[in-house]
């Protein structure tokens, strides 16, 4: 049927744009990449981009959705099913810091995702229901609005820590330790309860996991 053919071509065009966009974002960052470059990388005319996505931010939103699913899924697979939700939160967010540290284009991509309206809204609204599952023990009276407001705070902390590169003084260990301390305090978790999980995260080889997630995401986008 003609309608199915058009739909299939639209999906194929979109997938090509996603792969081309991800490739260019990883090479040169979000800010330096244009929609025309993405379209040419996909083997299409510059105008073809807008048949697939409204703008570059819409493409980044799709990539943000893909990356977040990948990192959360990987963190869950690293831990036993009955593991503490605090450790899962620490592992997920620590992994995210490692992904942003893999390269400067990735840092730019993640910081931008936490900054633009549609992508940051997706992140905040996706995280809010997870917060109830993770922190309900310490925030029993918090309703959804309060959790959303606190997610805005922890997302701001996340963006700030991702935006600053590690160096010989501000090591990855110091970054993760301070970052997780800030986030757990936002959700009223006592230090004696979260401290052991911070140490577990620091002992994990999250940098290798982060590189694998990026490689697998690119590979899946090409499929």
Predicted feature descriptions by range:
Residues 10-22, 38, 63-67, 71:
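Generic hydrophobic, amphipathic alpha-helix propensity
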Residues 107-112, 192-196:
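Short, hydrophobic secondary-structure boundary micro-motifs
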């Amino acid at each position: 049927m003609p309608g199915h053919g058009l739909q299939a071509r639209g999906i194929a065009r979109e997938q090509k744009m996603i792969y081309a966009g991800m490739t260019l974002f990883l090479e040169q960052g979000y800010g330096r990449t244009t929609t025309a470059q993405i379209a040419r990388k996909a083997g299409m005319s510059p105008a073809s981009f807008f048949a697939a996505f409204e703008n570059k931010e819409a493409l980044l939103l799709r990539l943000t959705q893909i990356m977040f699913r990948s990192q959360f899924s990987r963190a869950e697979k690293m831990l036993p099913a009955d593991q503490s939700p605090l450790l899962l939160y620490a592992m997920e967010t620590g992994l995210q810091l490692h992904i942003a540290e893999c390269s400067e284009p990735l840092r730019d991509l993640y910081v931008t995702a936490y900054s633009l309206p549609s992508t940051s809204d997706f992140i905040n609204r996706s995280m809010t229901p997870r917060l109830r599952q993770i922190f309900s023990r310490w925030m029993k009276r918090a309703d959804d609005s309060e959790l959303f407001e606190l997610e805005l705070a922890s997302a701001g902390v996340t963006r700030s820590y991702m935006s600053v590169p590690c160096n010989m003084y501000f090591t990855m260990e110091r970054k993760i330790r301070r970052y997780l301390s800030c986030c757990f305090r936002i959700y009223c978790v006592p230090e004696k309860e979260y401290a052991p999980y911070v140490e577990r995260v620091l002992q994990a080889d999250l940098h290798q996991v982060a590189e694998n997630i990026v490689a697998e995401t690119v590979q899946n986008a090409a499929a």
